[in-house]
């Protein structure tokens, strides 16, 4: 059985998708042609034969996209069908459409690039809110996102949107834009690894169920001043390992952790979040008190340790009522740095709604305990309370992929962490849809 090896922080996979083709190189990239050249009575059910491309052979029941494609309407991956997207494919979503483009995954998605050839989801105008996102269904069993760039999503759905019709995201109502990636099957599983989520108008991710590993990703420049936006928004029904991610400029929170939605069939969430780097988060308008860096509510009980919070609006926070399950959580030690006196005050002991631990490492004066990133430029006008998405008024600079958030030699952040905690998936997660792929190109036959 092939598994994601999170112990070694290696999450590599490959997948592919185009139109159904029988044992031949697939030249057709029409994403709406669910059958081989259409009309064989197999609509929306995947191929009846093995699909062979230059990269791999894919099992019966597959869709395979091998080349770049442009979407002008939403695509639905049916239950029981697996969509594979091969390395290097770019999916461009058109923005000038009546109903925002969504990719609704009722079946499985294996969207796996490589470091040299990432899979890219973008838009034609490259502006936030140009399209919706990847929205998964209640029967979606497996999703793999490896070396994937996802940008410019977050559009608000309409009643004609697939996500609304399938009652997938906030069922039965329209409440702002959809996340760039949403997973909801309590019994399903997903992995997000080595990927770059950026410039999405609302939440980068939103989880209401599922077993997942989120590792080695960058989440940058999410949300908007009017509606906010989290990088990682977790409700009840999840089991998650979240590690080694960089979260930059999340408008509201890097993490919003909650057990909202818990029921007889939706269990309380279990989560281990560790070794994450959180920078410049929480600048959104002050009328929403949840803006900050990490918000824990409704009996959430995460393991949240060894994380670095850098120049974010607040420290760890919870509401006055219905906050974290403090008895069953582990929320310390973490490392908090502030380069301004305002930042120091807003994460200090006694700060409104703050959760304080003496075992945390915190700046007590501006600039103290600088973790010394290898390469990072902070805005000269940086203001943790700016409340407007304007660099001139103190909002964060746009993310620069040349920045390096590893620590320099001698950094005070190189010590003080702990190792006496457990991951949820110490041996990784198996993805059976990948086990069925026979790679023909050794450069793309990835270890997972």
What spans do the regions from the language model cover?
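Bacterial N-terminal signal peptides that target proteins for export
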Residues: 1-11
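Processing junctions and N-termini across compartments
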Residues: 15-18, 59
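Low-complexity, intrinsically disordered short peptide segments enriched in small/polar/basic residues
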Residues: 1-3, 16, 434-437
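Generic N-terminal leader segments that precede the first folded domain
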Residues: 10-11, 24-27
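C-terminal motif of bacterial Sec signal peptides marking the signal peptidase cleavage site
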Residues: 19-23
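Extracellular beta-rich repeat passengers
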Residues: 27-86, 94-108, 113, 118-448
């Amino acid at each position: 059985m092939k598994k994601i090896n999170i112990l070694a922080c290696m999450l590599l996979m490959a997948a592919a998708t185009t139109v159904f083709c029988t044992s031949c190189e697939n030249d057709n990239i029409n994403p709406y042609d669910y059958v081989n050249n259409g009309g064989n009575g197999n609509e929306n059910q995947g191929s009846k034969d093995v699909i062979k491309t230059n990269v791999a052979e894919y099992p019966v029941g597959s869709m395979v996209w091998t080349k770049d494609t442009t979407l002008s309407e939403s695509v639905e991956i049916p239950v029981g069908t697996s969509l594979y997207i091969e390395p290097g494919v770019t999916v461009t979503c058109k923005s000038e459409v009546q109903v925002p483009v969504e990719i609704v995954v009722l079946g499985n998605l294996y969207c796996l690039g490589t470091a040299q050839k990432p899979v890219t989801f973008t838009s034609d105008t490259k502006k936030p809110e140009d399209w919706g996102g990847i929205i998964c269904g209640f029967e979606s069993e497996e999703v793999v996102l490896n070396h994937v760039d996802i940008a410019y999503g977050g559009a608000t759905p309409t009643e004609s949107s697939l996500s609304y019709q399938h009652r997938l995201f906030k069922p039965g109502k329209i409440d702002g834009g959809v996340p760039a990636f949403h997973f909801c099957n309590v019994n399903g599983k997903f992995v997000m690894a080595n990927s770059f989520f950026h410039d999405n108008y609302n939440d980068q991710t939103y989880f209401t169920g599922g077993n997942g590993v989120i590792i080695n990703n960058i989440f940058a420049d999410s949300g908007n001043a009017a509606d906010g936006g989290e990088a990682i928004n977790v409700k009840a029904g999840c089991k998650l390992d979240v590690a080694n991610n960089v979260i930059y400029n999340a408008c509201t929170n890097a993490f919003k952790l909650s057990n909202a939605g818990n029921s007889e069939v939706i269990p309380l969430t279990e989560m281990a979040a560790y070794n994450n780097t959180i920078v410049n988060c929480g600048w959104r308008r002050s009328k929403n008190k949840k803006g900050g860096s990490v918000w824990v509510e409704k009996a959430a009980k995460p393991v949240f340790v060894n994380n670095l919070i850098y120049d974010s609006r607040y420290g760890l926070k919870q509401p006055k009522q219905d906050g974290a399950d403090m008895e069953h959580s582990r929320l310390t030690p973490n490392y908090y740095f502030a380069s301004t006196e305002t930042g120091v005050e807003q994460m200090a002991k006694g700060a409104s709604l703050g959760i304080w631990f003496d075992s945390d490492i915190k700046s007590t004066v501006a600039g103290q305990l600088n973790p010394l990133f290898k390469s990072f430029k902070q805005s000269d006008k940086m203001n943790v309370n700016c409340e407007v998405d304007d660099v001139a008024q103190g909002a964060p600079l746009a993310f620069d992929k040349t920045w390096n958030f590893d620590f320099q030699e001698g950094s005070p952040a190189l010590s003080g962490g702990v190792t006496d905690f457990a991951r949820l998936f110490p041996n990784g997660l198996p993805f059976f849809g990948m086990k069925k792929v026979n790679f023909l190109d050794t450069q793309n036959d990835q270890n997972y």
